[in-house]
């Protein structure tokens, strides 16, 4: 008797809808993914992360093989979200500097001349952990400030991990996650900071040249990038 395997689709509605219509979303195009991968490879500390095989588990499930991408090695952050953080922060910075991220590499963006121009930029985000770590780490790389808000109940080890990568401030709020996001976004709007969030809502779906910029549209591109041998 065959075993039934229960699984959960981790796709996004718009992606699935476009696939059904026979078209691939533009942000998943091979040429787009290649450009993002090229940028990531220019970041100091970049290295291909290991791909582990689980043949025994695959055999149990009647599969040919199972592969697990070990992202704990990514930029020394013990998390894959440094990819999203550095890409989003770099995109915002390139807009300010008038650079094209598809043509610029990390060293060009991070030159001493450019760092002087962006030294007063401030990024803010809300996080349960790894997303905030990625944003704080990326902002620090460029000599910018990063404020990270975390929901109530966050354990101290997660707070300290974000402090350790260079966050300007890590604040554990009195709110749960959704209200913590709202709180961070409000502070971004009040201060003219850049909100870098991995949660989307109405009015926050793509980049706009306003005081509180939206990032999710770019971050979607990274899903494909991490699937490649990177």
Name the predicted role of every residue range.
Residues 1-230:
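PLP-dependent amino-acid enzyme catalytic core
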């Amino acid at each position: 008797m065959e075993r039934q395997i229960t699984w959960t689709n981790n796709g996004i509605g718009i992606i699935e809808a476009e696939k059904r219509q026979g078209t691939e979303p533009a942000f998943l195009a091979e040429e787009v993914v290649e450009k993002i991968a090229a940028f990531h490879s220019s970041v100091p500390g970049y290295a291909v992360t290991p791909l582990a095989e689980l043949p025994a588990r695959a055999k149990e499930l009647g599969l040919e093989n199972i592969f697990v991408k070990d992202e704990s090695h990514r930029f020394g952050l013990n998390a894959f979200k440094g990819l999203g953080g550095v890409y989003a922060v770099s995109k915002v910075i390139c807009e300010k500097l008038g650079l094209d991220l598809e043509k610029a590499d990390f060293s060009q963006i991070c030159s001493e001349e450019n760092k002087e121009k962006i030294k007063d930029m401030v990024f803010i985000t809300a996080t349960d952990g790894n997303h905030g770590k990625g944003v704080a780490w990326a902002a620090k790389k460029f000599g910018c400030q990063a404020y990270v808000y975390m929901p109530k109940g966050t354990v101290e080890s997660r707070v300290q991990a974000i402090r350790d990568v260079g966050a300007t401030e890590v604040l554990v709020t009195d709110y749960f996650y959704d209200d913590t996001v709202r709180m961070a976004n409000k502070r971004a709007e009040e201060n003219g900071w850049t909100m870098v969030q991995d949660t989307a809502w109405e009015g926050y779906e793509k980049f706009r040249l306003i005081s509180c910029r939206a990032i999710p549209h770019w971050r979607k591109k990274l899903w494909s990038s991490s699937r490649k041998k990177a």
